[in-house]
């Protein structure tokens, strides 16, 4: 499937406490990264206090390496400063250093960094796409996509994924490279991100055919990355969107994994910053409340439907799901030109991000409130949606 994950099965993280600071534990089966951690600071911390804490970490780490002959570790790698106030950092520390950090009163919690990765992707050649027609029609089985000519003009979609082939003809020069937090290749060598971007803003496959697309790469050629790297991409997208106008921005995250408080907090920071964020519910046919960032309530969580208006058998479900969108056998762009057919909640999510961009083009407003707007125009048609799950399927309100 197209959803990016590693945790099977997913579950709420257990928590432990080491000398005061909470350590968010991941369950068995989740691939944690050895001696790598994400540290999140207390709410309301000032920049001055954060800088002081970082200086203390660097001094203490160096002292341990030099004076105590501690095991060589890389120390602090990246700091997070979301415009909405969330602060933290990731790094490579031994247990003793984490114990020292945990004693600090200014630390909210510490989380072990974990791997995220694309699951097997279903591919079927030469199958016509149906998702666009379904978004623009109140009845299934259509072959025409009805939409307003504004088509998301003036909006910007941040695709936090494997990158995007920005030269693909589908984007007509509207796609740009934003940032790369996983490797030194500014290209989509996997294909997942280009497919997602095409569903949002492609001239043929896109819901919002005139929207701008910004590639934010957080996963490598194998579709592999880390929670800390994904959060770096989320931070960058939030800052860039605020500089250019958050009310005109949407973000898409067709990725996830086991419950991560840090991932959820970063997603909440994007929404608090005024950016509409659509996130995949997951492909394990379990309750999405046990995965992140899908379980964050302030974002728009998307499950996958079939051409027959039923829940896709792989799709996660549950109360955290906001809407269903087409996610089974979806045709979109592939790197180097042409198209491919993929399935997953990864494919459903850009239909929702694209619809958000489309509504921005119509002057319906932006920000996290777009999820409520999308739910209001959705139609009640999904069969067997899953326990405690909405049966709403997205619709662009064209009236057809």
UniProtKB/Swiss-Prot annotation:
CDD domains: Peptidases_S8_PCSK9_ProteinaseK_like. Pfam families: Inhibitor_I9 (PF05922), Peptidase_S8 (PF00082). It is found in: Secreted. Transmembrane segments: none annotated. Residues 129-400 form the Peptidase S8 domain. One of its GO terms (biological process) is proteolysis. One of its GO terms (cellular component) is extracellular region. Its EC number is 3.4.21.-. Residues 36-118 form the Inhibitor I9 domain. Glycans are attached at residues 58, 222, 252, 396. InterPro entries: PCSK9_ProteinaseK-like, Peptidase_S8/S53_dom, Peptidase_S8/S53_dom_sf, Peptidase_S8_His-AS, Peptidase_S8_Ser-AS, Peptidase_S8_subtilisin-like, Peptidase_S8_subtilisin-rel, S8pro/Inhibitor_I9. Residues 1-20 form the signal peptide. The active site is at 161 (charge relay system), 192 (charge relay system), 346 (charge relay system). GO terms for molecular function: serine-type endopeptidase activity. Keywords: Glycoprotein, Hydrolase, Protease, Secreted, Serine protease, Signal, Virulence, Zymogen. Residues 21-119 form a propeptide. Belongs to the peptidase S8 family. Secreted subtilisin-like serine protease with keratinolytic activity that contributes to pathogenicity. This is Subtilisin-like protease 7. The lineage of its organism: Eukaryota, Fungi, Dikarya, Ascomycota, Pezizomycotina. The gene is SUB7.
């Amino acid at each position: 499937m197209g959803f990016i994950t590693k945790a099977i099965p997913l579950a709420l993280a257990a928590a432990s406490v080491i000398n005061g600071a909470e350590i968010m534990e991941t369950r068995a089966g989740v691939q944690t990264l050895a001696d790598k951690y994400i540290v999140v600071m207390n709410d309301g911390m000032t920049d001055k206090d954060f800088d002081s804490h970082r200086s203390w970490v660097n001094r203490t780490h160096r002292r341990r390496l030099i004076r105590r002959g501690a095991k060589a570790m890389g120390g602090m790698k990246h700091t997070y400063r979301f415009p909405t106030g969330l602060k933290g950092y990731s790094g490579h520390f031994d247990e003793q250093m984490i114990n020292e950090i945990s004693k600090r009163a200014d630390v909210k919690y510490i989380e072990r960094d974990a791997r995220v990765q694309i699951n097997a992707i279903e591919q079927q050649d030469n199958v016509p796409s149906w998702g666009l027609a379904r978004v623009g029609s109140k009845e299934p089985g259509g072959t025409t996509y009805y939409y307003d000519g504004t088509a998301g003009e003036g909006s910007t979609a941040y695709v936090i994924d494997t990158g995007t082939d920005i030269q693909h003809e589908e984007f007509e020069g509207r796609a740009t490279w934003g940032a790369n937090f996983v490797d030194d290749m500014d290209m989509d060598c996997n294909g997942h991100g280009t497919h997602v971007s095409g569903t949002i803003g492609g001239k043929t496959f896109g819901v919002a055919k005139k929207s701008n697309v910004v590639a934010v790469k957080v996963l490598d050629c194998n579709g592999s990355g880390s929670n800390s790297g994904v959060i770096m991409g989320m931070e960058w997208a939030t800052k860039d969107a605020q500089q250019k106008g958050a009310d005109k921005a949407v973000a898409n995250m067709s990725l996830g994994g086991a419950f991560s408080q840090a991932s959820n907090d970063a997603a909440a920071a994007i929404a608090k910053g005024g950016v509409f964020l659509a996130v995949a519910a997951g492909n394990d046919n379990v309750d999405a409340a046990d995965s992140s960032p899908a379980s964050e309530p302030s974002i728009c969580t998307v499950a996958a439907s079939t051409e027959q208006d039923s829940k896709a058998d792989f799709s996660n479900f549950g109360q955290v799901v906001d809407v269903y969108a087409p996610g089974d056998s979806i045709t979109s762009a592939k790197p180097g030109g042409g198209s491919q057919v993929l399935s997953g909640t990864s494919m459903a999510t850009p239909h929702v991000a694209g619809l958000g961009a489309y509504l921005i083009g119509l002057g319906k407003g932006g920000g996290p409130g777009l999820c409520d707007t999308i739910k209001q125009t959705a139609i009640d048609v999904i069969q067997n949606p899953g326990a405690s799950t909405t049966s709403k399927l997205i619709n662009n309100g064209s009236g057809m």
